[in-house]
UniProtKB/Swiss-Prot annotation:
Leader peptide range in chain numbering: 1-20
Protein source organism: Salmonella typhimurium (strain LT2 / SGSC1412 / ATCC 700720)
InterPro entries (alphabetical): Poly_export (IPR049712), Poly_export_N (IPR003715), SLBB_dom (IPR054765), Wza_C (IPR040716)
Lipid addition sites, S-diacylglycerol cysteine: C21
Keywords attached to this entry: Cell outer membrane, Exopolysaccharide synthesis, Ion transport, Lipoprotein, Membrane, Palmitate, Polysaccharide transport, Porin, Signal, Sugar transport, Transmembrane, Transmembrane beta strand, Transport
Entry's localization field: Cell outer membrane
Membrane topology: Multi-pass membrane protein
Lineage of the organism: Bacteria, Pseudomonadati, Pseudomonadota, Gammaproteobacteria, Enterobacterales
Descriptive protein name: Putative polysaccharide export protein wza
Family label: Belongs to the BexD/CtrA/VexA family.
Length: 379
């Protein structure tokens, strides 16, 4: 009796093995019994929501980004030509009356001109001998000079007056984000442009998204491409900065593409300043897996911007056939965009091999059970 039980043990083990093989690999989550909120477009046809384009040399050429060319900026030139600094509260002015040193406070060895100058009060005035308070806020230096000269003429014959700014403290622009030295920059009598501000901030960091710099002026945002400005000389991207302007250089976290499928290293890749081509993306993923990939099925899935895309389409899909290695020439010229998904499909033989690998334990278990049953029957 004991021997019979011992011989039944392999059969029981086989049955256990088979029952284990009925569990498919991977986790599962059933929606049965759960409150499923059905959407209005739940019955969508995904095939009708995408456009598929086989890559050809002509299509690659059509998709190539048009290079920015050098452009002048006549409006900026006019702004700079007519630019005049207007005094604000906190500025320090130096007033010199020639041949009347008693009206001029000289800067000594241990005192700078900003220490000895005339500070503009919060109410917009400054004090000057003989004439008392002088309203200076919002005025140019020539307007202030003319006002002081006219009022001093009551006390001094033909006064020769000179006015300059010893310290610019009232007006600032702010540079933040991915620059080497963020902070505030003074608005002075020298016009400050976007390019000047970036250079004064020590340039961009490696994490900067120089294509989507944001300038906030009077509560409104403008997008500026420093790539077009600095790399291609497109001066139309340059702007004159005014008091209170904020120049923000964002991180390039959104400049990424995804490489998935039958590659040696599925990856999320970040674009650098020069962008990324399809060949570079595949190379950074250590290439396609030659044993499992379908070289004719390399796809770039490009989401269409905006709700529903164009005409209800959500993505354009570009297919590259790399069965012929010379097609890599097209891949080298095909430039990726942020959030592109590069997907390499599986070869049919690889799918078959994976199916066989999943079935082998079951087949072996059935065979083992059959052999065991035969042994028991003969016993």
């Amino acid at each position: 009796m004991m021997k019979s039980k011992m011989k039944l043990m392999p059969l029981l083990a086989s049955l256990s093995l088979i029952s284990g093989c009925t569990v498919l690999p991977g986790s599962n989550m059933s929606t049965m019994g759960k409150d499923v909120i059905k959407q209005q477009d739940a019955d969508f046809d995904l095939d009708r929501m995408v456009n598929v384009y086989p890559l050809t040399p002509r299509l690659v050429e059509q998709l190539r980004p048009r290079p920015n060319v050098a452009q002048p900026n006549m409006s900026l030139d006019q702004e700079i030509a007519s630019y005049q600094y207007r005094v604000g509260p906190g500025d320090v002015l130096n007033v010199t009356v020639w041949d009347h040193p008693e009206l001029t406070t000289p800067a000594g060895q241990y005192r700078s001109s900003s220490d000895t100058g005339n500070w503009v009060q919060p109410d917009g005035t400054m004090f000057y001998p003989y004439i008392g308070k002088v309203s200076v806020v919002g005025k140019t230096l020539s307007e202030i000079r003319s006002d002081i000269t006219g009022r001093l003429a009551k006390y001094i014959a033909d006064p020769q007056v000179d006015v300059n700014i010893a310290a610019f403290r009232s007006q600032k622009a702010y540079i933040s984000g991915q620059v080497n030295k963020s902070g505030q920059q003074a608005i002075t009598n020298v016009p400050l442009t976007v390019l000047d501000a970036i250079n004064a901030a020590g340039g961009l960091t490696d994490m900067a998204d120089w294509r989507n710099v944001v300038l906030t002026h009077n509560g409104k945002e403008q997008r500026i491409s420093l790539q077009a400005l600095m790399q291609n000389g497109d001066l139309s991207q340059n702007r004159l900065l005014y008091p209170g302007d904020i120049l923000y250089v964002p991180r390039n976290d959104d400049l990424k593409v995804f490489v998935m499928g039958e590659v040696k290293k599925q990856s999320t890749l970040k674009m650098d300043f020069s962008g990324m081509t399809l060949t570079e993306a595949l190379g950074n993923a250590e290439g396609i897996d030659l044993t499992t990939s379908n070289a004719s099925g390399i796809f770039v899935i490009r989401p269409l911007k905006g709700e529903g895309g164009r005409g209800g389409k959500i993505a354009n899909i570009y297919q590259l056939d790399m069965s012929d290695a010379t097609s890599l020439v097209m891949a080298t010229e095909f430039r990726l965009q942020p959030y592109d998904v590069v997907y390499v499909t599986t070869a049919p033989v690889a799918r078959w091999n994976r199916l066989i690998n999943q079935l082998l334990p079951t087949i072996s278990g059935v065979r083992y059970m059959t052999d065991t049953a035969s042994d028991i029957h003969s016993w």
